[in-house]
C-alpha cells in the first residue's frame, strides 16, 4: 500500500489514476469543470490545482500520485488562483442566471458561490452570438460556453460522432459543429449526452413545458400521460429523496394535482414491445433472414443506424418503441371512446431527449395524427412540479390509473442496458418458474460493460446475443459484424452508456454513484414485481382480444414504406 499526505492527513492509495481521485477518496470535494472519469484528461479549467510542499502548483487531474507525495488543496495561493480563474470565466459569460434553464444546477454558479466570488472586475466585451434552437432535442447557447470541452470529448469519445469541436483561436475560440452549421443540419442523433456533461447553460434541453401547461388548462382537452421506467428512480433526486429510490407513486400523486386526467405506465408499452419483438425475432430465426435483429426502442440509435449504416435498416425491428406503441394505443382508444368528446393529448415523461424527435417522425402518425403529442424529460417534469409549488417528497403514494397502469417487471428493466434482452428472453423461455428466470440473470446480459455477449440455448440451437450501450461501442460492434469477425442473432443497442437511466433528459449530475443507484433501483422494482413476464400481464391479453384485434401491425409496428428520418 502506498501513501500520500493531503492537508497534513496521511491517505492510502492503490491504483488511482491521478491525484484528484485520491483527493476525492479522502473526502475532499475538489470541484472541476473539465474532468470526467470516463473521458480523457483535458486539464483546461485549472480549478483542480493543488500545491506541493515545495510551493509548486499543478493540476491534480493530470498528475499521477506518487508514494510520499505531500500536497495541499486550499492554501491562500490556491484560493487566489481559483477565484481569479472564476472571475475570468464569469467576465466572458452571460450572467442572466435567474432566467437560465441551468439555474441551480450550474457548476459555474455553484463554484462562484462556494468560493465567495461576489464581484467581477472585468467587463464582458464579447459580441452576442445567436442561440441555436434548430434541433428538436437540445438548445445551444454559445454565450454561456466556458470552453471546458466536455461536450466535445463526450460526443467523440463516448458516442463516436464528433459533431462538436473547437473553432478559431484565442479570445474568438468557440465550440461548434463543422462549418458553424445549425445542429439540425448535422448528424446529431439527439442523445443529449453533451447536455449531461455541460457544466453551464450552454447546452440545455429543448423544453415543451409551456404547451403542456396550456393543454392542462384547456377544459376541452383530455391530457393523458405515460411515465417511462427510468424516470421513477431519478425524479426524486431534486427533492431530497435518496438516489435510486422508486418515486413512482409520489410522481403519480403530483401529476394528478397538476391536472393530468389519466396517468399510465410506459412499462405497459414495454410489455407490448416484448410481445411483438419476441414474435418477430422467432420469425426471423426460423426464416434465417434479416439477422441479426437490432432492437428499435432507442430513437438515437435508430437515427445513427439510418445515417451511417442505411444498409442495415432492414435489420432493425419493425416494432415501435414502447412510447410510440402506447401512444398509438391511447389515441386509438380515444377515437373509439364516443362518451368523451374532448380532444385527447398524449404526453410522455421520458429520460431521453431523442424521444422529442422520435414523436415527429412520419411513421409515428396514425390517421394523420401524432401518436404522442409532447415529450417532457425528467428534468422538465421536475421543473413543472416545482412551478406548481409541490414538494414531491411530501406527496402520498398513489396508484396508476387502470387498465394501463398494470405492467410487468420485464417492462421496468427496459430502463437499463440489457433489460430489453432479458425481457425478451423471459418471454421466450418455456419454464416460467423463478429458477429459470433467475438463470437468465447470469447469462452475461446484466452489468455495466459497454459490450456484453451471451449464448442462450433455445430448442435445438444456440442463440447468440450482444448487448451494447454507447454509440461508439455500437459502431465498433457493427464493424466486427460486417467484417464477419463476430456473428449474432439478436443485438440490443442503447445510445446512452448503461441505458436510459443515464439518458440525456435525466437530472444531473449523473456520476458513477448515481448510475449505480438508479441501476440497482430498477432491478429492486423488478424483484418486487409479482408479474415477471409480459405475457403474464392479463391486461395485455385483454388488449389483444379487444382494441388491438386485427390492428397489431397498424398500431404497434412501423410502416417501412414511409420515408425515414434524415
Give the location of each predicted region:
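Mobile "lid/hinge" segments at catalytic clefts and subdomain interfaces of large enzymes
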Residues: 162, 195, 381-385
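A short N-terminal beta-strand-loop micro-motif at the entrance of redox/enzyme domains
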Residues: 9-15
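Short strand-turn-strand beta-turns centered on an Asx-Gly dipeptide
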Residues: 6-9, 53-54
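Iron-sulfur-associated redox domains of electron-transfer enzymes in respiratory
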Residues: 15-68, 74-80, 206-566
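Fe-S ferredoxin-like electron-transfer domains
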Residues: 46-190, 203-217, 222
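Charged, low-complexity hinge/linker segments at coiled-coil and domain boundaries
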Residues: 197-203
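Extreme N-terminal starter segment of soluble prokaryotic enzymes
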Residues: 1-2
Amino acid at each position: 500500500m502506498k501513501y500520500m499526505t493531503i492537508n497534513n492527513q496521511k491517505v492510502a492509495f492503490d491504483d488511482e489514476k491521478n491525484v484528484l481521485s485520491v483527493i476525492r477518496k479522502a473526502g475532499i470535494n475538489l470541484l472541476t469543470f473539465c474532468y470526467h472519469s470516463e473521458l480523457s484528461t483535458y486539464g483546461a479549467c485549472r480549478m483542480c490545482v493543488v500545491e506541493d510542499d515545495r510551493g509548486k502548483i499543478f493540476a491534480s487531474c493530470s498528475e499521477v500520485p506518487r508514494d510520499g507525495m505531500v500536497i495541499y488543496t486550499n492554501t491562500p495561493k490556491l484560493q487566489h488562483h481559483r477565484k481569479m480563474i472564476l472571475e475570468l470565466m464569469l467576465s466572458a459569460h452571460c450572467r442572466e442566471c435567474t432566467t437560465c434553464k441551468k439555474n441551480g444546477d450550474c457548476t459555474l454558479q455553484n463554484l462562484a458561490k462556494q468560493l465567495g466570488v461576489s464581484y467581477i472586475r472585468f467587463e464582458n466585451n464579447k459580441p452576442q452570438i445567436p442561440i441555436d434552437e434548430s434541433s428538436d432535442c437540445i438548445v445551444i447557447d454559445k454565450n454561456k460556453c466556458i470552453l471546458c470541452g466536455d461536450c466535445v470529448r463526450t460526443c467523440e469519445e463516448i458516442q463516436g460522432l464528433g459533431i462538436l469541436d473547437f473553432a478559431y483561436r484565442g479570445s474568438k475560440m468557440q465550440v461548434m459543429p463543422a462549418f458553424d452549421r445549425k445542429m439540425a443540419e448535422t448528424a446529431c442523433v439527439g442523445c443529449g449526452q453533451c447536455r449531461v456533461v455541460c457544466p453551464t447553460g450552454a447546452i440545455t434541453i429543448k423544453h415543451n413545458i409551456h404547451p403542456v401547461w396550456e393543454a392542462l388548462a384547456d377544459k376541452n382537452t383530455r391530457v393523458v400521460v405515460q411515465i417511462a421506467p427510468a424516470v421513477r428512480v431519478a425524479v426524486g433526486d431534486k427533492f431530497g429523496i435518496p438516489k435510486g429510490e422508486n418515486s413512482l407513486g409520489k410522481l403519480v400523486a403530483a401529476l394528478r394535482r397538476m391536472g393530468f386526467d389519466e396517468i399510465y405506465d410506459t412499462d405497459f408499452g414495454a410489455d407490448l414491445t416484448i410481445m411483438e419483438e419476441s414474435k418477430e425475432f422467432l420469425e426471423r430465426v426460423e426464416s434465417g433472414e434479416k439477422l441479426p435483429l437490432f432492437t428499435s426502442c432507442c430513437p438515437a440509435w435508430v437515427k445513427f443506424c439510418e445515417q451511417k449504416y442505411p444498409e442495415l435498416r432492414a435489420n432493425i425491428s419493425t416494432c415501435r418503441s414502447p412510447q410510440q406503441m402506447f401512444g398509438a394505443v391511447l389515441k386509438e382508444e380515444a377515437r373509439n371512446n364516443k362518451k368523451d368528446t374532448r380532444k385527447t393529448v398524449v404526453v410522455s415523461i421520458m429520460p431521453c431527449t431523442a424521444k422529442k424527435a422520435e414523436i415527429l417522425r412520419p411513421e409515428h402518425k396514425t390517421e394523420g395524427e401524432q401518436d404522442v403529442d409532447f415529450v417532457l424529460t425528467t428534468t422538465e417534469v421536475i421543473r413543472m412540479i416545482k412551478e406548481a409549488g409541490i414538494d414531491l417528497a411530501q406527496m402520498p403514494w398513489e396508484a396508476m390509473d387502470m387498465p394501463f397502469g398494470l405492467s410487468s417487471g420485464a417492462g421496468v428493466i427496459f430502463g437499463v442496458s440489457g433489460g430489453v434482452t432479458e425481457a425478451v428472453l423471459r418471454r421466450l423461455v418455456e419454464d416460467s418458474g423463478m429458477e429459470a428466470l433467475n438463470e437468465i440473470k447470469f447469462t452475461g446480459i446484466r452489468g455495466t460493460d459497454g459490450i456484453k455477449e451471451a449464448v442462450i440455448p433455445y430448442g435445438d440451437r444456440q442463440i447468440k446475443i450482444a448487448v451494447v450501450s454507447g454509440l461508439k461501442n455500437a459502431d465498433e460492434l457493427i464493424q466486427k459484424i460486417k467484417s464477419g469477425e463476430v456473428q449474432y442473432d439478436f443485438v440490443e443497442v442503447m445510445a446512452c452508456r448503461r441505458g436510459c437511466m443515464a439518458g440525456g433528459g435525466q437530472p444531473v449530475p449523473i456520476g458513477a454513484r448515481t448510475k449505480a443507484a438508479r441501476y440497482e433501483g430498477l432491478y429492486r422494482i423488478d424483484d418486487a414485481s409479482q408479474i415477471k413476464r409480459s405475457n403474464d400481464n392479463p391486461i395485455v391479453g385483454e388488449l389483444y382480444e379487444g382494441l388491438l384485434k386485427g390492428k397489431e401491425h397498424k398500431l404497434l409496428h412501423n410502416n417501412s414504406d414511409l420515408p425515414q428520418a434524415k
